[in-house]
Amino acid sequence: MATIAQRLRDDHGVAASESSVRRWIATHFAEEVARERVTVPRGPVDAGSEAQIDYGRLGMWFDPATARRVAVWAFVMVLAFSRHLFVRPVIRMDQTAWCACHVAAFEFFDGVPARLVCDNLRTGVDKPDLYDPQINRSYAELASHYATLVDPARARKPKDKPRVERPMTYVRDSFWKGREFDSLAQMQQAAVTWSTEVAGLRYLRALEGAQPLRMFEAVEQQALIALPPRAFELTSWSIGTVGVDTHLKVGKALYSVPWRLIGQRLHARTAGDVVQIFAGNDVVATHVRRPSGRSTDFSHYPPEKIAFHMRTPTWCRHTAELVGPASQQVIAEFMRDNAIHHLRSAQGVLGLRDKHGCDRLEAACARAIEVGDPSYRTIKGILVAGTEHAANEPTTSSPASTAGGVPARP
């Protein structure tokens, strides 16, 4: 109406108020106005068949723990038959909070309704659609655990869940206004008490003067789905793209995946202390959860890319022991001081066995020790020249060539 009135003033010079425009439309388009206002009454709802869920803003709260003012929202679940409700104040509305509120509500009711009618929040619905909504994976996992159905309301249609929309003002006025809380936990416990002792005992005209709590106890409680024997483990899902370092970001941490998945978008499931990464329905990596930093499994890299990291000083000592005593002595010299700085040289010496064999490498190491220069370059030169069994000393590199190794110690 405001837009029409503004256009009349700007484009046609007609000084018409919004109320005048509204009366004119009601007079000349009475049938269209009446058609738009028609509502179809819902039939009766069976006990235990439906719960309606939504968030409503309560207000600002000073948190003594952080000395900051934060916004507080109320998670509200209303059983459509008895009108019995559950309220849980929260300061976060992420996936974990959304699912945790559902778990608390089911425990409060000691059962699960057959259908959950929720708003199209991203924590519950990834892609709203009238006929085939895409449910968030964490929420779908919760629904599967409790054997219930998620049935999102139509987008921008609050009348699809009037049982939870109407009590929001009542919750804010009766529970929240004029009260002070020392902690979020105290606030949540107070909300549970209020839901039972205040909201549950009010008389409702919609229930023909009955009280929601009494209606719930008498009829609806036994109609709810029983709670499963195993408690639900809170999970969160995220999606990201694998970087060229083979890591995927989950929260504030990075987790490695097999290198062949570089550039692909993968889903990550976080539950407790475990992070699982999925390609489709297959688990491709599992890590211990970290608050930040990197969690790297070197088996996710091509072998040639991780040789330095996999062939540790311990590996070098063990491999040299398998080759022979002379090789073991050479590697021990490398590892005696500043092992990490001489690791490349030790890896290089042991790598010569791939081309020349263990016997020749052992003989070359013995010859290098004999001439007093057991460096990588000298050992390689002996093998290339084929003089590891020569009676006379082979020609060795200049002293400067020992920079890549560690000379023998007296």
Curated annotation (Swiss-Prot):
Q: What does the similarity note say?
A: Belongs to the transposase IS21/IS408/IS1162 family.
One of the protein's GO biological processes: DNA integration
Q: Which domain of life is it from?
A: Bacteria
The signal peptide, as residue positions, is none
Which residues does the annotated region (Disordered) include? 390-410
Domain (Integrase catalytic) spans 40-220
| Protein keywords | Transposable element
The name under which this protein is listed is: Putative transposase Rv3428c
| PROSITE patterns hit by this protein | INTEGRASE
Cellular component terms (Gene Ontology):
extracellular region; plasma membrane
Keyword DNA-binding belongs to the record: no
PANTHER family, alphabetized: TRANSPOSASE RV3428C-RELATED (PTHR35004:SF8)
Record GO terms (molecular function): nucleic acid binding
